[in-house]
Amino acid sequence: STSGSNAATEGANKDKPLVWFNRQPSNSSTGELDMNALSFNDNTYYVGFDANQGAELQGEMVLKYITDNIDTIDRNGDGIIGYVLAIGDIGHNDSIARTRGVRSALGTGVEANGAIDSNPVGTNTDGSSTIVQDGSIDVGGTTYTVRELASQEMKNSAGATWDAATAGNAITTWSASFGDQIDVVVSNNDGMGMAMFNGWSQAQGVPTFGYDANSDAVAAIANGGVYNHVGIAALDCLRNLCRSHVRYNGAVKLF
């Protein structure tokens, strides 16, 4: 039977080292971690950033940049700091966490079922969305509104998510529709972020925030165009565990 096969497989593998990387096992709807998978045995590791920790860092960096550059960031002077958000995969726990992290830091998040809603808003130029709310930032006695103008899952027609080409098309549409209302571009990863950066925000001087440490994003940071990235790796941990060596220092036990 299927259950018998699963039991036999689990029995055969129960003592083998297990390394999770890039994505923490989680519920695709809520982002809640699968602690059974993360504690499969004593040699189970996750290599990478804690999804929530990295997400909070990205959100904090966006907020700090806005605050530090408040005199110049409002491109049309309307008192609203507008941002657009490229969402990688609405069912991926890293994407969920990164979207929540940005919204939490900027005060645009709305709680749904005990957590900040991570769904895309579509278009929200008038601030009427129920998925997000307008945030506010007070700098030097002046209060500015922060608004998520638009966000969408970057899924192409073949069903691939985290799609850079789709993000490039999205920024073309958004910039044509919103123009100088867009003050900040934020992405769940560098691939989508760089597509938007190269497609529009670089030429406009609009700050772009990504996540991953892709080589082209690192180069763009050096040139002063992209302002945030985070990177991870798993190979050393897996190799050392297979050779019965000490695990890679980047591995994290979350249980």
Q: In which residue ranges do the predicted regions lie?
A:
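A residue-level marker of the well-folded mature domains of exported/periplasmic proteins
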Residues: S1-F255
